[in-house]
């Protein structure tokens, strides 16, 4: 882990994060992280952390909006290795982008991640809603954007073992169009306490499930 400029581990947000004006990068744990002042690559590692609070942006205007349960916007210059690594994290909070601009990205874990994103062994069961449609490319539906306009800006991102509760993510505020996930799997709320719903999650040393903890959803043993 020596190469990382920012390491977040065993952290949690349980409160409400709200912004209502200006240029927004909003997340439960990280709002924005990018190049350092000298223009060199930064490396981000977020592990065994979670959000259970509401993360919300309410605004109108032309400013861009990036909102995610764990991080709003993680970006860097082009690099030859994964510079954003998110592992064993989850979101159970609502992610709400009540905006009227045309550039916005909302995701259960990350709103927007630029270049090489490695995300694995994560899940989201929180409601993800965005009000307007916006443009994006190299979209990574599922965990890197439960709303369809969450995105990564590089096609070689590594997304593995990602799960989202069915019915929590929609294409617009009117809840008319459910999101199609390309890199991830749905699980039904009725199966939230079934370890088989979470693929190869490590339930021996990292994750556990108990009916009286975390609403019956998987929780982190070292960060309950």
For every predicted segment, state its role.
Residues 1-224:
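Predominantly extracellular beta-rich ligand-binding scaffolds that present long acidic/polar faces
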């Amino acid at each position: 882990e020596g190469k990382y400029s920012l390491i977040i581990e065993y952290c949690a947000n349980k409160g409400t994060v709200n912004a209502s004006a200006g240029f927004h990068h909003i997340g439960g744990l990280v709002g924005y992280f990018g190049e350092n002042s000298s223009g060199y690559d930064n490396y981000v590692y977020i592990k065994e952390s979670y959000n259970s609070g509401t993360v919300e942006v309410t605004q109108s205007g032309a400013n861009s909006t990036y909102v995610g349960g764990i991080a709003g916007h993680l970006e860097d210059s082009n690099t030859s290795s994964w510079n954003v690594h998110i592992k064993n994290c989850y979101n159970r909070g609502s992610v709400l982008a009540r905006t009227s601009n045309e550039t916005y990205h909302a995701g259960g874990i990350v709103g927007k991640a630029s270049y090489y994103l490695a995300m694995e062994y994560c899940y989201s069961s929180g409601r993800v809603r965005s009000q307007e449609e916006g443009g994006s490319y190299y979209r990574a539906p599922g965990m890197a954007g439960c709303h369809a306009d969450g995105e990564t800006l590089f096609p070689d991102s590594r997304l593995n073992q990602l799960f989202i509760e069915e019915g929590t993510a929609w294409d617009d505020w009117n809840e008319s169009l459910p999101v199609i996930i390309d890199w991830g799997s749905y699980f039904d709320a009725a199966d939230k306490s079934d370890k088989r719903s979470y693929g190869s999650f490590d339930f021996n040393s990292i994750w556990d499930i108990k009916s009286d903890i975390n609403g019956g959803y998987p929780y982190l043993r070292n960060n309950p």
